[in-house]
Amino acid sequence: MASVPATMTAWTKTRPEVGGFAQVEHAVPSPGAGEVLIKTQSTSVCGTDIHIWKWDEWSRENVPLGTVTGHETSGTVVAVGEGVSTHSVGDLIAVECHLACWNCPRCEEGNAHVCENGSIFGVHGHGAFAPYFVVPAVNARHVPEGLDPGHASIQDPLGNAIHTLTGGPVEGATVAVHGLGPIGLFAVNAAKAMGAAKVIAVDWDNTYRMSLAKELGADLVLGKDDDVVAAVLEATEGRGADNSCEFSGAASALSNAIHSTRMGGYVNVLSVYGSGTPEVPMNEVVFRYLHLKGINGRKMWSTWDTMHDLLSRNLIDVDKVITHRMGIESFEQAVQLAMEGNCGKVVLDF
């Protein structure tokens, strides 16, 4: 670690208020047994970072003040801890932010993304809006050869999109994507790349992102001026979508997804509903034999395998989804831009 400085300046949640971030000096961490020290290359802004910026109820309950946040990231290994044989100095990696114990029943059954003893990198502990960070080596995933570090940093949201899509049929199916934030945009692109016969993209009034969805392959784009349920049924000869994916966190979008999915179809939900629990038309779910499923994170590691296959074959148009790249000094501007929504994915480079 001779070339690694002793201290660093990192964006830190210091005050219990909207914004509330400051650049604070921290010691550069040393990797413990089974860990790697990473020099950050790129970290992207996530919806979770916006929740933390707003200091909403979820953030107040989960994020300790003084935490360096940021969890969608890529970087280069600069030191390895005792017992690490899977990584070498110089390796480019991306982080799986769900830190698992690997011993509980959920981990042992292959669901480490919902580990009973798990925590989230950059939420419950220090993350990657910093020049250096440590993670368990198992969470430092090697990236496809030649991948741009900025592209490598978005594997968290791309993986979310793929995990949600694969909760139902994709190849040859009609897939409806409700909510066109960055994850929804990746879902549109990935659904096409994975062989969906038709992709229907739905948002409220973000014309910027609706246009992006069209460029990424959506066959039909719907907005606030459309009767979403009627339009989806018309586009599917009255049957409904085979696989509806809800990314918006809007109660109306969940209702539309349920009512516009075919008999025996799949409704996969990767959303946090911030304004109370949405009403779920359970009679529709029961009598139409709908498969309603909550999605959290990425399967470890089948989602990553699928994602790396798509990236290696250049089937994901990452450059279209990443609309803004800034230096880390522009962190506050980047979060504001992401909140306003006139963007796709915002990436901060170091």
Describe every region a protein language model picked out.
Residues 12-30, 47-79, 94, 115-124:
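N-terminal glycine-rich cofactor-binding segment
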Residues 62, 99-178:
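NAD(P)H dinucleotide-binding glycine-rich loop of Rossmann-like/cofactor-binding domains
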Residues 145-226, 230:
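Mid-domain Rossmann-like dinucleotide-binding core that forms the NAD(H)/NADP(H) cofactor-binding site
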Residues 201, 214, 219, 251-313, ...:
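Glycine-rich phosphate-binding loop and adjacent beta-alpha segment
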Residues 2-8, 39, 226-227, 255-259, ...:
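C-terminal hydrophobic helical "lid"/dimerization subdomain
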Residues 29-43, 58-105, 144-146:
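Glycine-rich beta-strand-centered segment in the early N-terminal region that forms part
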Residues 228-238:
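Short amphipathic alpha-helix with an adjacent loop that forms part of the alpha/beta core around
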